Amino acid sequence: MPKMKTNSGAKKRFALTGSGKIKRKHAFKSHILTKKTKKQKRNLTHTGLVASVDVSNVKQMLCMK
């Protein structure tokens, strides 16, 4: 059976934490920022975690399953 290929888009977008959770960046922070408030832009800067319902799909894309 051939090796699984890692999804190249996913490996650029997700990172693993030490405890095994998956980090992600927030969307809506690249352009059209003039109509967003300072607070919105500041909160979008922080990293988030992948939701529990999506973890299995992301792990499959990263060939961790």
Curated annotation (Swiss-Prot):
Q: Which cysteines are joined by disulfide bonds?
A: none
GO molecular function (one)? structural constituent of ribosome
InterPro entries per UniProt: Ribosomal_bL35, Ribosomal_bL35-like, Ribosomal_bL35_CS, Ribosomal_bL35_sf
Could you give a single Gene Ontology term from the biological process aspect?
Answer: translation
List the Pfam families: Ribosomal_L35p (PF01632)
Top-level division of the source organism's lineage: Bacteria
Which first-to-last residue range defines the signal peptide?
none
Q: Which keywords annotate this record?
A: Ribonucleoprotein, Ribosomal protein
One Gene Ontology CC term in the entry: cytosolic large ribosomal subunit
Q: Which PANTHER family match?
A: 54S RIBOSOMAL PROTEIN BL35M, LARGE RIBOSOMAL SUBUNIT PROTEIN BL35M
Spell out the family assignment given in the record's similarity comment.
Belongs to the bacterial ribosomal protein bL35 family.
- This protein is called Large ribosomal subunit protein bL35
**Origin species:** Parabacteroides distasonis (strain ATCC 8503 / DSM 20701 / CIP 104284 / JCM 5825 / NCTC 11152)
